[in-house]
Amino acid sequence: MLLTLLKCKLHKATVTHSELEYEGSCAIDGDLLDAAGILPYEQIQIYNIANGERFTTYAIRAEAGSRVISVNGAAAHKANPGDRVIICAYGQLPREEAARFHPRLVYLDADNRIVRTGSDIPVQAA
């Protein structure tokens, strides 16, 4: 049996552009893609902290160092510049591998600079 797990995430990215007329997808700074391990054209889930929208699209590479997060095409209706979002990619692993797997977690500031990385989400206190 394969289990679907969080592969990686960009936590609290700031949307810099929202381009309705662009050909779909989400353009992400190439350095951020590399840090998270997200490949161009890989399916991603985007969770908009500002408005609660959750949607699926795919990643495309924006210029490295640009700090761009551009939500494009129809998805542009779901995010505006300045919105904070969580961008996740998932993978499937056999149960035995899943038990040992740790995701790549990349935490960003409001300017889409990496402030820290990790591989475990802390236990949530009651």
Swiss-Prot record:
It catalyses: L-aspartate + H(+) = beta-alanine + CO2. Substrate binds at residues 57, 73-75. Is synthesized initially as an inactive proenzyme, which is activated by self-cleavage at a specific serine bond to produce a beta-subunit with a hydroxyl group at its C-terminus and an alpha-subunit with a pyruvoyl group at its N-terminus. Keywords: Autocatalytic cleavage, Cytoplasm, Decarboxylase, Lyase, Pantothenate biosynthesis, Pyruvate, Schiff base, Zymogen. GO terms for cellular component: cytosol. Transmembrane segments: none annotated. Pathway: Cofactor biosynthesis; (R)-pantothenate biosynthesis; beta-alanine from L-aspartate: step 1/1. The keyword Metal-binding does not apply. Its main location: cytoplasm. Signal peptide: none annotated. GO terms for biological process: alanine biosynthetic process; pantothenate biosynthetic process. The modification Pyruvic acid (Ser) is found at residue 25. One of its GO terms (molecular function) is aspartate 1-decarboxylase activity. SUPFAM superfamilies: ADC-like. Its EC number is 4.1.1.11. Its cofactor is pyruvate. InterPro entries: Asp_de-COase-like_dom_sf, Asp_decarbox. Binds 1 pyruvoyl group covalently per subunit. Catalyzes the pyruvoyl-dependent decarboxylation of aspartate to produce beta-alanine. This is Aspartate 1-decarboxylase. It comes from Thioalkalivibrio sulfidiphilus (strain HL-EbGR7). The lineage of its organism: Bacteria, Pseudomonadati, Pseudomonadota, Gammaproteobacteria, Chromatiales.
